[in-house]
Amino acid sequence: MESIDAVLYINLEHRKDRNEHILHEIHKITHKNIHRIDAVKRDNGVLGCGLSHIKALEYALEHEWKTVLILEDDFTFKSISIDDHIELLFNYDFDVGLLSHNVLRYSDTDNDFVKRVIYSQTTSSYIIKRDYIPVLLQNMRKAMKDMEKNGRRTENCIDIHWVPLMLKDKWYASYPEIGYQYGNHSDIEQGFREYGC
C-alpha cells in the first residue's frame, strides 16, 4: 500500500482481543509503519473515543507523513480487492477518504466505486491528508469541549460533528464500503454491539 505512509490504530490497553484482531486486518494491506494509539479511557466512552481520535491525529502531525490511515480496533476488511479499492480513492484530490460509512449520502463521481460524500457517520476507518489534519482536529476538539461541558448529545459526537466539513471540503468514500465494525463487546456502549457498518 504505497499511497499510505502510516497506519494508526486506536486500541484500549485491556482489549488484547481487539489488538490481535486489528493487526490481522492491517496485515492484509501492509506490514510496515503500523502504530498503536493507546485509546483514552473515560466513563463516558463516546468522549474517550473522540479524545482518542484527537490523540491519533496529533500523533500523525508529529511525523512527516503525508497520508495516514486511521482505524478503530474493531474495523474489519470485507473480502474484496482491498488494495485496488483504496488506490481508486487516490485518483481523486481528497482531504478525507472513508473506507467505511453509515447512513451515506453522496454524489456520483466518474467512477462507480468512489463517491463524493455529503453525509456519513462512523469514524471506524478513514484516510486523511496531512494538510487537512488541523481542520479535522479543530472540529473534533470543539465537539469534545462541548461534550465535556454539556454531556453527550448527538450533535457533539465526532461522527456527527464532522458532517459540515463534508459539505464544504473534499470528502470521498469507497463504494460500497470496503470494511465494517465487527460485532463484539463495546466499551463505549458497555455491551455487545453489531453496527453493520
Describe each region flagged by the PLM:
Residues 1-71, 75-197:
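An acidic/histidine-cluster motif and surrounding catalytic segment
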